[in-house]
Structures are given as structure tokens and as C-alpha cells.
């Protein structure tokens, strides 16, 4: 291992620029030494491999073998590195200050580091126990200064290392040889430029290291199995003030008072303790802590709380996305894979479903075939053979002519119409011939019947035309035929009277339809009642229009003077209807003798 460290420090490029096989051999030598150290030492975990195989393997395969070894012993190695950090740094600083370029000093330092590492491995178990005891004994306030002390010690070590570098750079300047390249002048010095760049890099590394010091990469990783300490309200806020208890005059048992105080204290603590880092989704669980307060609610308030929960649940279900089967027509890309297997689909089958072939079906078919062969029952359809191949098909073939028609479309329609009329005329002639044939046959049958039985066959009824003259009813009263009904001798209103029903329970409407009162609807009854009222009101209404006209005439005449109204009898009256007396004296005409 020390040889590998020496080669890496002296000339690391020699290893990197080697062949892959040579590099793998160097890695094999280092990892084999680590495995032997783990076997000989008192490490709790042992390596899974005894040695690393390099022959015939590439770098990736060799790396995975190394990873298996390091993963099995990484815990002890990291613990050893953390313990040796303070030991290796001062020794390294001293060696750099004394002899930086001497390989013997480096080898001695590495050997010392290895020996110290082995001793630390031997005492790893004891150190872990001591650390656990110290961690348990220390409080949270004591842990913070320890972290600060570690930071300050690390910063001091880095500053010392930087000073030693400056000293070594000064010594290098004293023993520096003249410019080998010949590029130095009074304005530019190559050695000074290199020193400045190294100093700038060191300052950058120091600043980055100070930022990385906040994170301790060698501390123990927190395990998930360890229970996290609960954070309560008391850790951040003061305890609530207790109300002074009033002293009652009645003397009570001190034990009962203590029990009551404990119960009150427990209930108050349950109310105060809250999980400050709980999510919003855990709010119902946080409310469960205060279930004791629900006991103080009335039955109506509890019922309202349950109703609100149900309403909230229903609203969430209504707003939530519906299932694909409730969205109507869904294509295959819009539904999950194999979703139809769990659904019961209803659709119309256009064809007869194919029967499922089972062992029972096949056995029954085989038995039926054997039985029919034994019985020679071959009732299959006979195969049809066409003997006359030259026979033409019954359907006439349509031939479309390529010659342009000489007739117009109107002429073609006209020919079709006349052809249909000719066919109808032919059918009428054929019908006349059929009627003549049937008449001749009927005469023949009658003659044959007469010859067979003259006494029992009546004469055939001959069709005769009867002409009736519609004469008035008065002229037919004297000579009325006996076979005619009395309806022809009645007046039309006697036969059919609109609005008058034949029975008491019927009503005849204006259109002549007779309906029973029970068949009338409420609207029909109301309509008939309103019509009857209008009819009665018209009958009882006096002749207002005529009187109004007469009054208008009288009013116009009354405005004039010396108006006399003479009626049909020759009486003279004034406009108001009073008889008008003559004011003249006695005359020869009106003197009584």
C-alpha cells in the first residue's frame, strides 16, 4: 500500500498513462492488501472476496469487484479516517516543513499512518461505546460549542498548512536556478507568476473548504429506525397560565383534589400538544387529539358536523374526475389497458353465438356418429349435379346499346304510356271473354241440373232494374207501398232535430253528435253551461237599442217649440206623449146642438 502511495505522489501520470492491464494490476495489489488487512485486523465486517481477478476483465468489471470490497468495509474505513484526521495532518505538516522532496520521509509518514490506523481499528469498538456514552451525557447546548471547536481547529490547521507552503515557496526562490527558457525580463518573472497563481488557487480552495466545513461528511448517518423526537408546543412557547382555584368552604378529601388536578393537567396538556410540522392533510388527525372537547357538544351540533362531512364528501365526488365508463363513448386510447375485462358489456349480437366445444359435446357427437354408422342412417342432403350445362339462366340479360337513340326522352315516355294503355285495353277484352265463358258455363250447369231434378231446382234469379220516382209525400199518402218505411213520409225536422236528444240522458251538439252527459268532460260541461247562460241573458234582455234611438229622437225634437206628434189614430200629442188640447174657441164644427 505504501508503494502505491509513493508512486501516486512521486509520478501519478506514470500510472494513468500505463496500459489498462498495468493499472488494473496496481489496483489489484492495493485492494488485495486492504483485504489482507481486514482479515488480519479486528474489523467487524469482512470482505466478500478473497482477492480481485484482473485477467481477461475490463475496467468496469474490476471496478465492481473493488466496489463490493469497499461496500463491505466502508463503515470501518470511514470511522478510521475520521479518527486519523487529526493525527495525519500535523505529521504531514511537520514532514513538509522539514523535507518536502524526500521520499524516505513520506514513506515513514505512511508507515506511521498505517500503524496508527491499525491501532485505531483495534480500539474501534471501545471508541464507539465511549462516544455513545458521551453523546447521551451531553445536552443540546453542549453540542453546539463542540461543532464550533471542530471548525476552528480545522481552520487553524489550514492556516498553518498555507504558511508552510509560503515558507517552502520562499526556500524554492532562494535555491531557484536561473531562467531555463529565457523569457524573464524586468517586467515579467515566470517564477513569480507561478507563485501568484498557486496562491490564488490556495485561497480559492480555502474559501471553498470553509463553505464545505459546515457539513461534516464523516458523522454518523441517521438511521430510519430511530424514532424522531416529537416536537411539542412547550418547546417554542410558554406554558399557559393557570387560573387561581377558588377555595370553597366545604372541606373535601385531599386525595380527590389531587386526582382532579391531575385530570385537569392531563386534559390541558393534550390540548396544548400539537404536531407543528404536520401537513394540511393531517389536520383531521390533529383534530382527533381534541376529541375530548366533542363531548361538550350538543347532539344537534354533532349532527350538523356529520352533515357537513357528508356534504363535503359528496361535493368532492361530484367535482372529481369520473370513471371512463361514465363518460359516454370512450375510445381504446382513452381508457386504461385491459379495462374491458372487468366490465359487463351489453350489446346486440347479429349472429348466433358460437357454441363452446367441451369434452361432453365432443363425446355426444362421436356417439351420434357411431350410432348412425351402425344403423346406416345417412340422411344428409343429396348433392346436386347439373346435367344440362347449356341451359341458360332464367333472368334475361340486359344489353346496353352503344347506339344513340333516335327518339327524345319525351317520346320514350309517351311510348311507355301508350303501351300501358294498350295492355289495359287488352286486359279488358280478356275480362269480357272470361265473363262470357263463365256465363256459358253457368247455363250449361243449370240445364244439367234441370235434367237431373226438375221438381227441386228453382228458376234462376234474373237481374232486373227498378226505377223509383221521388214524389212528394202528400201525393203518396193515398197509395203508399207496403215495403217502404215511414221515414220517407216524415219531415226532415221530424227525422233529425238539432239540439234535441232522443233520450233524457243525452245531449245533442250543434254538429249533430249525440253524447251522454256522463261522457262529457269538465271543459265541455262548463262550455255548455256558459252557452245556456248567454242564451237566457239574451232572452231576458229588453230592447235597449230601440229605446235609446227613440229617446235620442225625442230629445232632439223637444229642443224645438210648437211640435205636435200625430199617431196613426190621428191623436195629437206633444213630444212627452201627453195629449195636446186645442186652445181655439167654439166653432161651428164643435158646437153641440
From Swiss-Prot:
Residues found modified as Phosphoserine: 176-177
Residue spans of biased composition, Basic and acidic residues class: 148-177, 186-195, 236-255, 266-276
Main localization of the protein described in the UniProt heading: nucleus
The organism of origin for this protein: Saccharomyces cerevisiae (strain ATCC 204508 / S288c) (Baker's yeast)
Subunit (UniProt): Component of a heterotrimeric complex containing IMP3, IMP4 and MPP10. Interacts with snoRNA U3. Component of the ribosomal small subunit (SSU) processome composed of at least 40 protein subunits and snoRNA U3. Interacts with the SSU processome subunits EMG1, IMP3, IMP4, KRR1, NOC4/UTP19, NOP1, RPS4A, RPS4B, RPS6A, RPS6B, RPS7A, RPS7B, RPS9A, RPS9B, RPS14A, RPS14B, UTP1-UTP18, UTP20-UTP22 and UTP25.
Modification N-acetylserine occurs at: 2
Family the UniProt entry places it in: Belongs to the MPP10 family.
Taxonomy, superkingdom: Eukaryota
Role noted for this protein: Involved in nucleolar processing of pre-18S ribosomal RNA. Required for the early cleavages at sites A0, A1 and A2 during 18S ribosomal pre-RNA processing.
The protein's name: U3 small nucleolar RNA-associated protein MPP10
Region (Disordered), start-end ranges: 90-297, 564-593
Gene Ontology molecular function, alphabetical: identical protein binding
Keywords: Acetylation, Nucleus, Phosphoprotein, Ribonucleoprotein, Ribosome biogenesis, rRNA processing
Pfam families hit by this protein: Mpp10
GO cellular component: a single term: sno(s)RNA-containing ribonucleoprotein complex
Residue numbers carrying Phosphotyrosine: 181
Feature: compositional bias, Acidic residues: 128-147, 202-232, 256-265
GO biological process, one term: endonucleolytic cleavage to generate mature 5'-end of SSU-rRNA from (SSU-rRNA, 5.8S rRNA, LSU-rRNA)
Subcellular location per the Swiss-Prot or TrEMBL entry: Nucleus, Nucleolus
Amino acid at each position: 500500500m505504501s508503494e502505491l502511495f509513493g508512486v501516486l505522489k512521486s509520478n501519478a501520470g506514470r500510472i494513468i498513462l500505463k496500459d489498462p492491464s498495468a493499472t488494473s494490476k496496481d489496483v489489484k495489489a492495493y485492494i488485495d492488501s486492504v483485504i489482507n488487512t481486514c482479515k488480519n485486523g479486528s474489523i467487524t465486517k469482512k470482505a466478500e472476496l478473497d482477492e480481485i481477478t484482473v485477467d481477461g476483465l475490463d475496467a468496469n468489471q474490476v471496478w465492481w469487484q473493488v466496489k463490493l470490497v469497499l461496500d463491505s468495509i466502508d463503515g470501518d474505513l470511514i470511522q478510521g479516517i475520521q479518527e486519523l484526521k487529526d493525527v495525519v495532518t500535523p505529521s504531514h505538516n511537520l514532514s513538509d516543513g522539514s523535507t518536502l522532496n524526500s521520499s524516505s520521509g513520506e514513506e515513514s509518514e505512511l508507515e506511521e499512518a498505517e500503524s496508527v490506523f491499525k491501532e485505531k481499528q483495534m480500539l474501534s469498538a471501545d471508541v464507539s461505546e465511549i462516544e455513545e456514552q458521551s453523546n447521551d451525557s451531553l445536552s443540546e447546548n453542549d453540542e453546539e460549542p463542540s461543532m464550533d471547536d471542530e471548525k476552528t481547529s480545522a481552520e487553524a490547521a489550514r492556516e498553518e498548512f498555507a504558511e508552510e507552503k509560503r515558507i517552502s515557496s520562499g526556500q524554492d526562490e532562494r535555491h531557484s536556478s536561473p531562467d531555463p527558457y529565457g523569457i524573464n525580463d524586468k517586467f515579467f518573472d515566470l517564477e513569480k507568476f507561478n507563485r501568484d497563481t498557486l496562491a490564488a488557487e490556495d485561497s480559492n480552495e480555502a474559501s471553498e473548504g470553509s463553505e464545505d466545513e459546515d457539513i461534516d461528511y464523516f458523522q454518523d448517518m441517521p438511521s430510519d429506525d430511530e424514532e424522531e423526537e416529537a416536537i411539542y408546543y412547550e418547546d417554542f412557547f410558554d406554558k399557559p397560565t393557570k387560573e387561581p382555584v377558588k377555595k370553597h368552604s366545604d372541606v373535601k378529601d385531599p386525595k380527590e383534589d389531587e386526582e382532579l388536578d391531575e385530570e385537569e393537567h392531563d386534559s390541558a396538556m393534550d390540548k396544548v400538544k400539537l404536531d407543528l410540522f404536520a401537513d394540511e392533510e393531517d389536520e383531521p388527525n390533529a383534530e382527533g387529539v381534541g376529541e375530548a372537547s366533542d363531548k361538550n357538544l350538543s347532539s344537534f351540533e354533532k349532527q350538523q358536523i356529520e352533515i357537513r362531512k357528508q356534504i363535503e364528501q359528496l361535493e368532492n365526488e361530484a367535482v372529481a374526475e369520473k370513471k371512463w365508463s361514465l363518460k359516454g363513448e370512450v375510445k381504446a386510447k382513452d381508457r386504461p389497458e385491459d379495462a374491458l375485462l372487468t366490465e359487463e358489456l351489453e350489446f346486440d349480437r347479429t349472429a348466433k353465438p358460437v357454441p363452446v366445444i367441451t369434452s361432453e359435446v365432443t363425446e355426444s357427437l362421436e356417439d351420434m356418429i357411431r350410432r348412425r354408422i351402425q344403423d346406416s342412417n345417412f340422411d344428409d342432403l343429396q348433392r346436386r349435379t347439373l346435367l344440362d350445362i347449356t341451359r341458360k339462366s332464367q333472368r334475361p340479360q340486359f344489353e346496353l346499346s352503344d347506339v344513340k337513340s333516335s327518339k327524345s326522352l319525351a317520346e320514350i315516355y309517351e311510348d311507355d304510356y301508350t303501351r300501358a294503355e294498350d295492355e289495359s285495353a287488352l286486359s279488358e277484352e280478356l275480362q269480357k271473354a272470361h265473363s262470357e265463358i263463365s256465363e256459358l258455363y253457368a247455363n250449361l250447369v243449370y240445364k244439367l241440373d234441370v235434367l237431373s231434378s226438375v221438381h227441386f231446382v228453382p228458376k234462376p234469379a234474373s237481374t232486373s232494374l227498378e226505377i223509383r220516382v221521388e214524389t212528394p209525400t202528400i201525393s203518396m199518402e193515398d197509395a203508399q207501398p207496403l215495403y217502404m218505411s215511414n221515414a220517407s213520409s216524415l219531415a226532415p225536422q221530424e227525422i233529425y232535430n238539432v239540439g234535441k236528444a232522443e233520450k233524457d240522458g243525452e245531449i245533442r251538439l250543434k254538429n249533430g253528435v249525440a253524447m251522454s252527459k256522463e261522457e262529457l268532460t269538465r271543459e265541455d260541461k262548463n262550455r255548455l253551461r256558459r252557452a245556456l247562460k248567454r242564451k237566457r241573458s239574451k232572452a231576458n234582455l229588453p230592447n235597449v237599442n230601440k229605446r235609446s234611438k227613440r229617446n235620442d229622437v225625442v230629445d232632439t225634437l223637444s229642443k224645438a217649440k210648437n211640435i205636435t206628434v200625430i199617431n196613426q189614430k190621428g191623436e195629437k200629442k206633444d213630444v212627452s206623449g201627453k195629449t195636446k188640447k186645442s186652445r181655439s174657441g167654439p166653432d161651428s164644427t164643435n158646437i153641440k146642438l
